[in-house]
Amino acid sequence: MSTLFESFEVIPAVDMQDGDVVQLVQGERGTETRYGDPVVAAKQWVEAGAKTLHLVDLDGAFEGDRMNATAVDAIIDAVDIPVQLGGGIRTANDAASLLDRGVNRVILGTAAVENPDLVAELAESYPGRIIVSLDAADGEVVVSGWTESTGIDPAVAAARFADYGACGILFTDVDVEGKLAGIQSSVTARVIDAVDIPVIASGGVASLDDIQTLHTTGAAATVVGTALYENKFTLADAMEVCESD
């Protein structure tokens, strides 16, 4: 289906803050619900059938320093499936050290928007391993932990980063992130239509119908956090929805 995934994937999120797994509402600090040890969570998702894990260092996203590096290292050592990581990856050296350490794909957000040449540089050195994260609120790309609006259209940005060599786009709809209120597929569809590389959809997934919609819309995968941690459905059920087509 894509160069990143053999078929549509439902990817569990392991978002880390202060050493715990957390889920935030619309990315806002102070809204977090905590779900315990990241390594335990990662192992549980592997046992549940995950084919990829999505790790986010939220302290890195907010502060710019990778505060959960120890947990990331432990997860890499503990699981035998591909791991993609975002949050606080600001420089080529940051990305290279993670890729060399065993992270399969790094996700560049703020750093990519502020310095697109970084994407091109890394994509040349690590082809197929650089994902650009585009987070949008009110139809505009936001950066710095979703706190600053750029005025950039996410579909336009996605096309530009595809040209720069990104192997995929992680698109997060901040307007619905963490609210368990369902997705806004039209926004995601615009990004999918703008590029020929895989788009991983994130934000607002609350039901199996949401997953089916994203699959039908053309997403290569979806990252799911709150809905899985709150037992709205199981990972097995979510994966089965897309395998039954």
Curated annotation (Swiss-Prot):
Keyword Transmembrane: no
Reactions listed under catalytic activity: 1-(5-phospho-beta-D-ribosyl)-5-[(5-phospho-beta-D-ribosylamino)methylideneamino]imidazole-4-carboxamide = 5-[(5-phospho-1-deoxy-D-ribulos-1-ylimino)methylamino]-1-(5-phospho-beta-D-ribosyl)imidazole-4-carboxamide
InterPro entries: Aldolase_TIM, His_biosynth, HisA_bact_arch, Isoase_HisA-like, Isoase_HisA-like_bact, RibuloseP-bd_barrel
UniProt KW keywords: Amino-acid biosynthesis, Cytoplasm, Histidine biosynthesis, Isomerase
Amino-acid biosynthesis is among the record's keywords: yes
One GO location term (cellular component): cytoplasm
Pathway(s) it belongs to: Amino-acid biosynthesis; L-histidine biosynthesis; L-histidine from 5-phospho-alpha-D-ribose 1-diphosphate: step 4/9
EC identifiers of the protein: 5.3.1.16
Enzyme class (EC, first level): isomerase
Pfam hit, one: His_biosynth
Residues at the active site: D15, D135
GO molecular-function term, one example from the UniProt record: 1-(5-phosphoribosyl)-5-[(5-phosphoribosylamino)methylideneamino]imidazole-4-carboxamide isomerase activity
Superkingdom as given in the UniProt entry: Archaea
SUPFAM superfamilies, A to Z: Ribulose-phoshate binding barrel
Biological process annotations from GO: L-histidine biosynthetic process; L-tryptophan biosynthetic process
Compartment annotation: Cytoplasm
Record-stated family: Belongs to the HisA/HisF family.
NCBIfam families (alphabetical): 1-(5-phosphoribosyl)-5-[(5-phosphoribosylamino)methylideneamino]imidazole-4-carboxamide isomerase, PRK13585.1
HAMAP family: HisA
Listed name of the protein: 1-(5-phosphoribosyl)-5-[(5-phosphoribosylamino)methylideneamino] imidazole-4-carboxamide isomerase
